[in-house]
């Protein structure tokens, strides 16, 4: 079984953790941007069918 020879430094650990956090931040930002464009109707990646509020008589 492969075992690391030395302990990972706190400096490297912090860098890796920040990279991981930044990926989550960008994913959340993209999701929020997409939701915003869908709600305003300016989305270019989704085709949303608009339902009219007509009553059947």
Curated annotation (Swiss-Prot):
Keywords: Chloroplast, Plastid, Ribonucleoprotein, Ribosomal protein
Subcellular location(s) per record: Plastid, Chloroplast
Keyword Ribonucleoprotein found: yes
Entry GO terms, CC: chloroplast; large ribosomal subunit
GO molecular function per UniProt: structural constituent of ribosome
GO biological process, one term: translation
Top-rank taxon: Eukaryota
Entry-linked SUPFAM superfamilies: Zn-binding ribosomal proteins
Subunit structure: Component of the chloroplast large ribosomal subunit (LSU). Mature 70S chloroplast ribosomes of higher plants consist of a small (30S) and a large (50S) subunit. The 30S small subunit contains 1 molecule of ribosomal RNA (16S rRNA) and 24 different proteins. The 50S large subunit contains 3 rRNA molecules (23S, 5S and 4.5S rRNA) and 33 different proteins.
Membership in a protein family: Belongs to the bacterial ribosomal protein bL32 family.
Name the UniProt record assigns to this protein: Large ribosomal subunit protein bL32c
